[in-house]
Amino acid sequence: MAQARLNLKGVSALLLDSDQFSRGLIASMLRGFGMESPVTGQTGAEAMAYLHGNSIDLCIMEAMLPDMSGAELIRWLRRPEMEKLRFVPIVVLTSYAQLRLVSAARDGGANIIVRKPVSPQSLFDRITWVARVARPFIDGGNYAGPDRRFQVVDPPDGNYKRADDARRGPSSAGPAQPVNKLVQAVSKGPSQ
């Protein structure tokens, strides 16, 4: 069975990871998906400085940055003043999948949290899932981000692992965040 291919040519991404090796490895994966030059950084301050004058289509960040938590940076991005950037899909990577870190990232407004080490196939699947699953964007008093309730959303790899998942079948989602280049790249289907 042929695997789908994702071509991220024209998609801009910000990759934040304090570990140089991990950052380089993930950047190589993104280039393998067709992304020409992901912007990389180590700290939340670097990200904030870059984002004040630039736009991105995807943000991939470590859950704990040297100067702040990923959740703090996500909340900063999801503020109303950030206009277009507040809807950017955010993938949080973590080596420590402690409930506290995962909950903080989710409650901050992350689209998905992925445990490291991450394989190219796993990263591909998660990026594709984030782009394809139209989760409603919630803008409430204490929270701004994708709907945190996963009860009606298919698993990222499409594999139903529980008996009640198979009975429920694929879901349909409501209105989502605006379409960006990432969503368009995934919607085009396999690259040629």
Model features per residue range: what roles?
Residues 20-42:
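Two-component/phosphorelay signaling modules centered on CheY-like receiver
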Residues 27, 72, 86, 97-112, ...:
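Alpha4 helix (beta4-alpha4-beta5 surface) of REC/receiver domains from two-component response regulators
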Residues 40-58:
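Acidic, metal-coordinating helix/loop segments flanking the phosphotransfer/catalytic sites
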Residues 62-64, 94:
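Active-site residues of response regulator receiver
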Residues 66-67, 98:
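The feature encodes the CheY-like receiver
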Residues 69-85:
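Short amphipathic alpha-helix used as the core "switch/output" element in two-component signaling
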Residues 100, 118-131, 135, 139-141:
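C-terminal output helix
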Residues 132-192:
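CheY-like receiver
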